[in-house]
Every structure is written in C-alpha cells, then in structure tokens.
Amino acid sequence: MLEPQENGVIDLPDYEHVEDETFPPFPPPASPERQDGEGTEPDEESGNGAPVRVPPKRTVKRNIPKLDAQRLISERGLPALRHVFDKAKFKGKGHEAEDLKMLIRHMEHWAHRLFPKLQFEDFIDRVEYLGSKKEVQTCLKRIRLDLPILHEDFVSNNDEVAENNEHDVTSTELDPFLTNLSESEMFASELSRSLTEEQQQRIERNKQLALERRQAKLLSNSQTLGNDMLMNTPRAHTVEEVNTDEDQKEESNGLNEDILDNPCNDAIANTLNEEETLLDQSFKNVQQQLDATSRNITEAR
C-alpha cells in the first residue's frame, strides 16, 4: 500500500524513467516451437501436428425426369390411355357438361400419373409439341391398328395363338370326318383342274346348245299359245303342256347322254342340273304370264 503523504497527495512512482521488459515475438502459426496449442490441430493417431487433408465431397448427379417422346410412349403414357375410360360411364344427350367434366378429370389423372411435375395446361402443350415426333406417330398408328405395343401385349397374343393351336389339334383329333371332307374337297378341285381344254370346250358347247333349244321352244310355244287363245280352244293348253313335257324329257335325255360321255361326270352334272332348274323356273314363269293374259282375254269377251 502506498502511504499517503501530506496534503493527501499520494506519492506515485516515476514510471517514465523505468525501462520496459523486452519480450520475443511470437513464432509463426505452423512453427513447431509454439507451445500454446494455437497452431495446427494434433493428429489423433500419430500425435503429431501434421496437417490432415480432408477428402472432397462427392456429389451424385441425378437425372431430372423429362417429358419426352420415350416417356410419352412408355407403359404409363399413350398405351395406358387406351384403358383409362374403360370404367367411365357417360350419360349422353342432355348431360354434355357433366360428361366433359368426367373426361377432363380422367385425363388429368392420367397426366398426373405420367408426369406430376407439370400442370395440366402445360402438360397438354408439351404433348401437342411431342405429337410431331416419329416415335409418337408410330405408337399412335399401332394403337389405331390394334397392334401389340408393350411386352404384355406380345405375351398375350402368343398365349392366344398357342391356345388356338391346341384347340385346332384337339378338334382334329376328336373329329376325323373333317380330314375326310378336306380330302374330298381337294380331290374335287384337282378334278376340275385336270380337265383338258377339249373337255371344257365340249361342256361349253353343250350348255350353249341347251340354251338355244330352250329359247327356240319357248318362242314356238308362245306363238302357238297366242294362236290357240284366238281360236279359244281349251284343248290347246293340254296339247302344249304335253309337248313341253316331251321336249323337256328329250332335252334332259340329251344332256344326260352328253354328261355320260364326259369322264368328270360328278363335277359337271351338278352345274348342268342347276342351270336346268333355273331354265325350268323361268319357263314356268312365262307359262303363268301367258295363262294370265289368256284369262284376261276370255273375261273381256
């Protein structure tokens, strides 16, 4: 303690003439001479103050999903749009606004499942732009033609083909008559192909002769019927019917003889019989018309 002097003034030491102590400067931070622990952090394993290199952080680059042509034709894209409206029931006429809301709601759901990052308006603009791409156009063509697009479609088609083949095999095994029918049809087609040109010309000539005979006899019968109607003799009808029956028998006998001469009897007989029935039907129609005209004439008299 400093003792107070007179007049209450404390006698202070004279610091002006006292020399200060000289301290050495601090060493640099990385110097091993520092002992205050403010240098480099000591290594835990080695215990030395050597610097430790920190490895750089590895940044993983993640691909940002984009709405491109490949994503649009993927499983959730245009192929999924075929089955979006399977369970939708539209009300029809008078409920157009409700049906439109339902349609837009289903489309929004499909767009959100495909690419939830975009709003529906931006999604529609993007799809409209992608519609000109070649991949999208080919996908749309395959959808319109009902062709397989996804792997599931190919698998289902192969399964159906295999089932159909198994069904065909079992049906042929169970029904042996089908094979006999196919063999008979093949034999008939071979017969028709094996006809020579001479035989075909003969068949055509017989057809033409039969048609000419029928037409000539129809004309002669119509003329005689007109004359008989003028004479008003009921006996004429019976005579004409007898003549026509005899003529038909003669023609049928002639055709049968021609058919017997032909080696391919079965194939030709069917065609000639069909033509003969058609000619008989046309003759009957003409006969009915003539009978009707004769009745009208007699009633008028």
UniProtKB/Swiss-Prot annotation:
The keyword Phosphoprotein applies. The keyword Membrane does not apply. Residues 67-143 are annotated as: Interaction with TIMELESS. Coiled coil: none annotated. Its main location: cytoplasm. InterPro entries: Csm3, TIPIN/Csm3/Swi3. One of its GO terms (cellular component) is nucleoplasm. GO terms for molecular function: DNA binding. Keywords: Cell cycle, Cell division, Cytoplasm, DNA damage, Mitosis, Nucleus, Phosphoprotein. Residues 1-61, 240-261 are annotated as: Disordered. It is found in: Cytoplasm; Nucleus. The modification Phosphoserine is found at S194, S222. GO terms for biological process: cell cycle phase transition; cell division; DNA replication checkpoint signaling; mitotic intra-S DNA damage checkpoint signaling; positive regulation of cell population proliferation; regulation of nuclear cell cycle DNA replication; replication fork arrest; replication fork processing. Pfam families: Swi3. The modification Phosphothreonine is found at T233, T244. Belongs to the CSM3 family. Plays an important role in the control of DNA replication and the maintenance of replication fork stability. Important for cell survival after DNA damage or replication stress. May be specifically required for the ATR-CHEK1 pathway in the replication checkpoint induced by hydroxyurea or ultraviolet light. Forms a complex with TIMELESS and this complex regulates DNA replication processes under both normal and stress conditions, stabilizes replication forks and influences both CHEK1 phosphorylation and the intra-S phase checkpoint in response to genotoxic stress. Interacts with TIMELESS (via N-terminus), which impairs TIMELESS self-association. Associates with the MCM2-7 complex. Interacts with RPA2, PRDX2. This is TIMELESS-interacting protein. It comes from Homo sapiens (Human).
